[in-house]
């Protein structure tokens, strides 16, 4: 079982306090891992800083070859990574193996190629006797903080563009789900030069704060909660570090009277509840037009009730447990508060499940109002709300009336309406007649309190660079 840190090309045990790592399907402790000590955090950052002097000057081809090697290793060890992810996160094993690992491999391969296409946009004589050039250079040492919902995938989203651009990275996975990142460290040790990639373990207060606040760290990339994002922005402000924030969402799913209801039902059944709803783009906030609202409630209620919750090792399991006991309690509280409102109708689910593990029943709540907390706040669990709307202007206003701005979807046969809504929705991504689809070539990132900066795509690669102007007199 992986339990060591990667610092300056060496696997070492943590010197800090031991923390338990749980299997959320059973509630049992898998193992205890020692956190990085303050001295080890400092050593990792300084190793990255030393390595940057050479790594930042390597050719894109050289960096690409190592990223491709890492992609191959992950692919060759897909079963191992999937089993660790399933055990540590509670994900159905078949989802981790068949959905997530191939996407992770693709991210590394995409950025390996993208590294060789990065260039400046201008070169020429803008002043007589002088030639100007634009360079895109690496930032330096990047501190990356990965979340617990997709531990290895989010690590890939952060590592691939940062390394491709020529940065050196110190990454801290969530202390709840560290196993796949620590396993990745075991392979990365023999691929990258010492110090280029460092992997730490520990809590935010004990490891995250000294890491993100370190004087040698020039950029911090976070996928996490708004509260964590606020803390890191404030914590790093005195040193004026670049920050890259993906901070969650509450995706509106706008369903018009002319929508294909069967497609909507299948889309929400799948993408409202994938990963037990622990996804910042989950289709969790449905607005259904009044002409089809009742029919959609009935159809979707039956579909959600048919979802199978069970052991992650069962091929027929569609939903595993939530990530932790604390998160189970948060989701339970949010649903109980919604149920206490007289106008909320629990169509199906609405409670935690008996037995071992952190399981919550797939839940559909109808009759929600725009001002309800269940509509306004991210639950991050297998919980979907439904609200009826009258017309296009009303639903546009409601969809945008939130602190979040990550993802949204519009379901209609009217192409003009789809374009109108897409142009006015205040979200980083809007899908039309689908939801949740992501590809390495297209950017992912939010607006408003969902954060800023892009993951994936060439835009994501550019976020890990600095633009520099070089002027030569001749």
Curated annotation (Swiss-Prot):
Name of the gene encoding the protein in the UniProt record? patD
**What is the recorded function of this protein according to its Swiss-Prot or TrEMBL entry?**
Catalyzes the oxidation 4-aminobutanal (gamma-aminobutyraldehyde) to 4-aminobutanoate (gamma-aminobutyrate or GABA). This is the second step in one of two pathways for putrescine degradation, where putrescine is converted into 4-aminobutanoate via 4-aminobutanal. Also functions as a 5-aminopentanal dehydrogenase in a a L-lysine degradation pathway to succinate that proceeds via cadaverine, glutarate and L-2-hydroxyglutarate.
Among HAMAP family, the record links this protein to: Aldedh_Prr (MF_01275)
Q: Which UniProt keywords apply?
A: NAD, Oxidoreductase
Query: What GO terms in the biological process aspect are recorded for it?
Result: L-lysine catabolic process; putrescine catabolic process
For this protein, the Enzyme Commission number is: 1.2.1.19, 1.2.1.-
Q: Where does NAD(+) bind?
A: 146-148, 172-175, 209, 225-228, 280
So which domain of life are we looking at? Bacteria
A Pfam family per the record: Aldedh
Enzyme category, top tier: oxidoreductase
Q: What is this protein called?
A: Gamma-aminobutyraldehyde dehydrogenase
NCBIfam families in the record: ABALDH, PRK13473.1
Q: What else is known?
A: 4-aminobutanal can spontaneously cyclize to 1-pyrroline, and 5-aminopentanal to 1-piperideine.
Catalytic reactions on record: 4-aminobutanal + NAD(+) + H2O = 4-aminobutanoate + NADH + 2 H(+); 5-aminopentanal + NAD(+) + H2O = 5-aminopentanoate + NADH + 2 H(+)
- Its source organism is Citrobacter koseri (strain ATCC BAA-895 / CDC 4225-83 / SGSC4696)
């Amino acid at each position: 079982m992986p339990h060591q840190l990667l610092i300056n090309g060496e696997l070492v045990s943590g010197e800090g306090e031991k923390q338990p790592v749980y299997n959320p399907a059973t509630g049992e402790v898998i193992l205890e891992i020692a956190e990085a000590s303050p001295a080890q955090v400092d050593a990792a950052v300084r190793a990255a800083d030393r390595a940057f002097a050479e790594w930042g000057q390597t050719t894109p081809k050289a960096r690409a070859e190592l990223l491709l090697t890492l992609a191959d290793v992950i692919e060759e060890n897909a079963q191992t990574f999937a089993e660790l992810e399933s055990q540590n996160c509670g994900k159905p094993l078949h989802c981790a193996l068949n959905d997530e690992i191939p996407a992770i491999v693709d991210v590394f391969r995409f950025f390996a190629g993208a590294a060789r296409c990065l260039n400046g946009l201008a070169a020429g004589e803008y002043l007589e006797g002088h030639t100007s050039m634009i360079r895109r250079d690496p930032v330096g040492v990047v501190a990356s903080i990965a979340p617990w919902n997709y531990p290895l995938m989010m690590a890939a989203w952060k590592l691939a563009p940062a390394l491709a651009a020529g940065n050196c990275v110190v990454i801290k996975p969530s202390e709840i789900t560290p196993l796949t990142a620590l396993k990745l460290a075991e392979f990365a040790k023999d691929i990258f030069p010492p110090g280029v990639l460092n992997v730490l373990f520990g809590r935010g207060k004990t490891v995250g704060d000294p890491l993100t606040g370190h004087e040698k760290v020039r950029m911090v990339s976070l996928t996490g909660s708004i509260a964590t994002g606020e803390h890191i922005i404030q914590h790093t402000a005195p040193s004026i570090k670049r920050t890259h924030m993906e901070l969650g969402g509450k995706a509106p799913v706008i369903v018009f009277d002319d929508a294909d209801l069967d497609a909507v039902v299948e889309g929400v059944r799948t993408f409202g509840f994938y990963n037990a709803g622990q996804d910042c783009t989950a289709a969790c906030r449905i607005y259904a037009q009044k002409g089809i609202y009742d029919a959609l409630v009935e159809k979707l209620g039956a579909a959600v009730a048919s979802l199978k919750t069970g052991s992650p090792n069962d091929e027929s399991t569609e939903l595993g447990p939530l990530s932790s006991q604390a998160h189970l309690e948060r989701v339970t509280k949010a649903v109980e508060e919604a149920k206490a409102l007289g106008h909320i109708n629990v169509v199906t689910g609405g409670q935690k499940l008996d037995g071992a593990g952190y399981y919550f029943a797939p839940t559909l709540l109808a009759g929600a109002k725009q001002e309800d907390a269940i509509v306004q706040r991210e639950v991050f669990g297998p919980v979907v709300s439904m609200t009826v709307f009258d017309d296009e202007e009303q639903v546009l206003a409601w969809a945008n009336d939130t602190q979040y701005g990550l993802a949204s979807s519009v379901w209609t046969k009217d192409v003009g309406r789809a374009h109108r809504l897409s142009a006015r929705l205040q979200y980083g991504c809007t899908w039309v007649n689908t939801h949740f689809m992501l590809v390495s070539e297209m950017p992912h990132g939010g607006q408003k309190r969902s954060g800023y900066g892009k993951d994936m795509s060439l835009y994501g690669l550019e976020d890990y660079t600095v633009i520099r102007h070089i002027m030569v007199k001749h």
